[in-house]
Design a protein with these regions (language model features):
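Glycine-rich active-site loops that engage anionic ligands at enzyme catalytic sites
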Residues: 1-221
Length: 221
């Protein structure tokens, strides 16, 4: 259940599930997110989950209904019908794409081959999709050391680049700027143009499969 909520505009409420960013907190967010999607209330225009918050955008004519619904949500601890998919995503960790592997080695006190085994054996939770269409925030790596963002973000990062900051990973769906430490590249399509929806969804899981540079180039062709 969420801890607090507040009205953030005439047509939106923000539910706050606490400060911690972890699987259990996010599971509560996703539980309510999936519940609202399943119920398909006519007065809810959009629902946006994040690590530990849930934004509900509603039709202003139904403010009383949304207030009653939020009170109801507070009593729902877990919604069991959470459909999730585990995605196996091929990634090439070759140094040509892992431009910041030295940062990873220094921050986590392990050589990059060891990190590759560590990263590719982790089952990541899709915490949220945001900032650009299809961009997934994945966690959590079992590390207790800090790997900060780059001091000088890159102006241009190729689509498919995989980045790491602390215990989180992202996959850049499009060419863009960014400050995450790049560790590899994938040809996985993060956005379905036919359905106009992201391929990954909050609550899904991801496991990376390490492939050679030759295999990666063949996959791109």
């Amino acid at each position: 259940m969420f801890i607090t909520y507040q009205q953030t505009s005439e047509q939106s409420y923000l539910l706050d599930y606490g400060e911690d960013i972890n699987f259990n907190t996010n599971k509560k967010v996703i539980s309510h997110f999936k519940y609202l999607l399943k119920k398909n209330y006519k007065y809810i225009l959009n629902v946006v989950p994040s690590f530990n918050k849930l934004l509900i955008v509603f039709d202003i004519e139904f403010k009383k209904d949304i207030e009653n619904l939020i009170k109801k949500l507070k009593s729902i601890k877990d919604y069991d019908e959470i459909d999730s998919i585990q995605h196996l995503i091929s990634i090439c960790y070759d140094e040509e794409y892992a431009l910041d592997y030295k940062n990873v080695e220094n921050a986590f006190s392990m050589d990059f081959d060891e990190f590759i085994n560590f990263h590719s054996s982790t089952i990541f939770n899709v915490f949220m999709i945001g900032f650009m269409p299809g961009l997934p925030f994945l966690g959590l790596l079992s590390v207790n050391k800090s790997l900060p963002r780059l001091e000088n973000p890159r102006i241009s990062i190729p689509a498919g680049s995989v980045g790491v900051v602390d215990n989180l990973s992202v996959i850049y769906p499009n060419q863009s700027s960014g400050g995450w430490n790049l560790i590899g590249k994938t040809s996985f399509n993060l956005f379905n143009k036919n359905t106009n929806k992201p391929t990954l969804n909050p609550g899904d899981s991801v496991k990376f499969k390490s492939i050679s540079k030759k295999e990666f180039i063949e996959n791109e062709e």
